[in-house]
Amino acid sequence: MAIANDIGLDLTPDGRAAMERLNELSNVTIEVGYQADQKAADDETSLAEVAYWNHYGTLHKDGSVMIPARPFMDAIKKHSEELSEFSQQALSSLETADAVSNAIGSQAKSMIQDAIKDEEWAPNAPITIEGGWMMNEYGKKGPVPVHIKGKSSTKPLIDTGALRQNCQYVIKKGKK
């Protein structure tokens, strides 16, 4: 309200309420993705690591692709204009800064989940789908054989559904 008063304007009650929500939101950060304490199906690996490996891809020691990059987290950037429009609508239609933050977080989370489910990604390797034995060159004492169980889905990024289902958003308040 100080800006409006500085130039001799007064805001309508709706305008004042929107300005208050904006002021509250100026100290809010919405983080969307995977938390370090979330575990993958093997209960040893963090889901954040699995998401990172799949988003950026991984390489064998010889430089060949082990896991191709499937940048599903870029869905927010890809749909930034849509998210911006959604945010403006949320700001004008919702009563509190918390409601606005939750609506934006939920929308961004849905964008990532939809990307996992709907985008066309590099296909899975046959061993990923069918299962079998392969050498893991990253064993502590050199290459070791590991068993790949095979996936329940041929679609990349979909196996147990944990990556899609466990995407979260966290709202952090305070000075940035």
For the regions a language model picked out, list residue spans one by one.
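Short, Lys/Arg-rich flexible segments
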Residues: 1-176
